[in-house]
Amino acid sequence: MGSGYQLLQLPRERFRKTSFLVWVIILFQRAISMPLGIVTNSTLKATEIDQLVCRDKLSSTSQLKSVGLNLEGNGIATDVPSATKRWGFRSGVPPKVVSYEAGEWAENCYNLEIKKSDGSECLPLPPDGVRGFPRCRYVHKVQGTGPCPGDLAFHKNGAFFLYDRLASTVIYRGTTFAEGVIAFLILSEPKKHFWKATPAHEPVNTTDDSTSYYMTLTLSYEMSNFGGEESNTLFKVDNHTYVQLDRPHTPQFLVQLNETLRRNNRLSNSTGRLTWTVDPKIEPDVGEWAFWETKKNFSQQLHGENLHFQILSTHTNNSSDQSPAGTVQGKISYHPPTNNSELVPTDSPPVVSVLTAGRTEEMSTQGLTNGETITGFTANPMTTTIAPSPTMTSEVDNNVPSEQPNNTASIEDSPPSASNETIDHSEMNSIQGSNNSAQSPQTKATPAPTASPMTLDPQETANISKPGTSPGSAAGPSQPGLTINTISKVADSLSPTRKQKRSVRQNTANKCNPDLHYWTAVDEGAAAGLAWIPYFGPAAEGIYIEGVMHNQNGLICGLRQLANETTQALQLFLRATTELRTYSLLNRKAIDFLLQRWGGTCRILGPSCCIEPHDWTKNITDEINQIKHDFIDNPLPDHGDDLNLWTGWRQWIPAGIGIIGVIIAIIALLCICKILC
């Protein structure tokens, strides 16, 4: 026993060395794991509580989902002259790029190619990986020149230029972008399924993506003195026809104006340049509800046949190469008539109507003298390949949404034919006379553009060509980007009954503004019922908590408008709370960064680290969704239809059938009991 005990004992010297080595290892391990700085026992918790205490709460800012929000939500002006004033050049400031995961569908995007007077480029090429914004309703493509007083173009309000999941502080050459800020959305950790793979790439070119249900329309411009105090912007109809832009306007107005000029053969039919100016009396806020662009319903419609096209001046100058030289200036105006007798002219130019706030006004037009030819010098305008839209003469029913989102539309620039060298109003008058006497009018139109594949928004109305339309319009459907008809037939404008019905239909459909859409490379449905939190940029203040609103088809217009107004009011009510929560999250993000070297916030603060600012956004958002479900998703039945089984006296039929069934069951039960007993 004693010998065994002695065998288990270590020599005293070896025991000391072993104990010293063990203590050195323990102290070294504690020294390595000990955070830098003074940490007391009262502030350091030994247990790991990150996943225990904060399991159902936000324990780290890694749960924030980055989202790009467009500045259009603030109601800013989106026309090119107004937008370019928000951008300026600076030197010595390095660009910054921030990535984000999802974004809104933008109503207006921009694409710039600006050169200096010496021919050098003003804007840098995009870095590798920077692609254009993938969801744009209208792309404003601007080409021109300017002084460009600086190295890079920044946003004067501190906002970002949103590209495809990358937001930059500078504008890149030839790359489509939208103005916006980066926000964060609080999301729980997503559940990963091994059988459901995450999409590797979101399609950039929406025209090639048949599932995008969205159509991109490109508007071309020429601009001089870009970046200077006073710039000049021209809307490009074709290579030789332009429209002077001197006041804010909607993209729908430009689309309709383009179609008006093409339909009425008001393009430059020579190598000279023809520039039209728009009369100040013509309201440029025509078109549909442009998402949230101006927060109002548009009811005015631009008809081409009632506009007054007047040539103001023609300057000629013979050059050595014997080419015609000159600058042609034209003015587009109108003068409403005082009585309805002018609606049916016999020898006068065509007549159309203008719908203004539900009121129909008629007017006559005048044009060039018979056989007058527009000639000018050879110009070298900026070249673009896409014009705003083709000629359209089809009529649209706005109350019936499209059931086929994968239709195609035509949109490409096409030069005027050589046969249109002159503008002869005698031919137009004869055409007008035939329109007055027949129900299938034929109007003179420019050649139909070539087709390029486009996808349609299911919210938009499909325009169907009807018999008797012009050959140019019959070549393909009209553009789905407009809820109201842009160019109506002359015979339609001469019929008061048809005009009145169309006016009522337009005023009704215009109240139905499209819902908001969001594109993302992951799951769009994951953001339902959660709050958008403005984060980056001073322009973030005022961005509403829009949430995710899905498309609705077959809606009752009045109830839909009521639901939209109610949701907007509730969203405004949430702004103050959201901003306070934003500041709290910003402070917490800074704390997480500073305490990362000490093991994280939860390791030092314990259960106090859990972020739980009371958020009632989900409760109110649920109420918003309930309103949308009650008033929008479930259309009310038509009580005027007596053939409906659930209206009138027939609504008692199901109840009667149920009562009869109960009586039969009771009788059968009594019979069975009598037989068995």
Swiss-Prot record:
Residues 555-596, 616-635 form a coiled coil. The signal peptide region modulates GP's high mannose glycosylation, thereby determining the efficiency of the interactions with DC-SIGN(R). N-glycosylated. Residues 673-677 are cytoplasmic. Residues 55-202 are annotated as: Receptor-binding. One of its GO terms (cellular component) is viral envelope. Residues 306-486 are annotated as: Mucin-like region. Glycans are attached at residues 41, 205, 239, 258, 269, 297, 317-318, 339, 406, 420, 435, 463, 564, 619. Residues 34-651 are extracellular. Pfam families: Ebola-like_HR1-HR2 (PF22307), Filo_glycop (PF01611). CDD domains: Ebola-like_HR1-HR2 (cd09850). GO terms for biological process: clathrin-dependent endocytosis of virus by host cell; entry receptor-mediated virion attachment to host cell; fusion of virus membrane with host endosome membrane; symbiont-mediated suppression of host innate immune response; symbiont-mediated-mediated suppression of host tetherin activity. InterPro entries: Ebola-like_HR1-HR2, GPC_FiloV, GPC_filovir-type_extra_dom. The record marks R502, S503, D638, H639 as: Cleavage. Residues 315-349, 370-483, 489-508 are annotated as: Disordered. Residues 315-326, 370-421, 428-445, 458-472 have a biased composition (Polar residues). The mucin-like region seems to be involved in the cytotoxic function. This region is also involved in binding to human CLEC10A. Belongs to the filoviruses glycoprotein family. Filoviruses entry requires functional lipid rafts at the host cell surface. Essential for infectivity, as it is the sole viral protein expressed at the virion surface. This is Envelope glycoprotein. It comes from Reston ebolavirus (strain Philippines-96) (REBOV). The lineage of its organism: Viruses, Riboviria, Orthornavirae, Negarnaviricota, Haploviricotina.
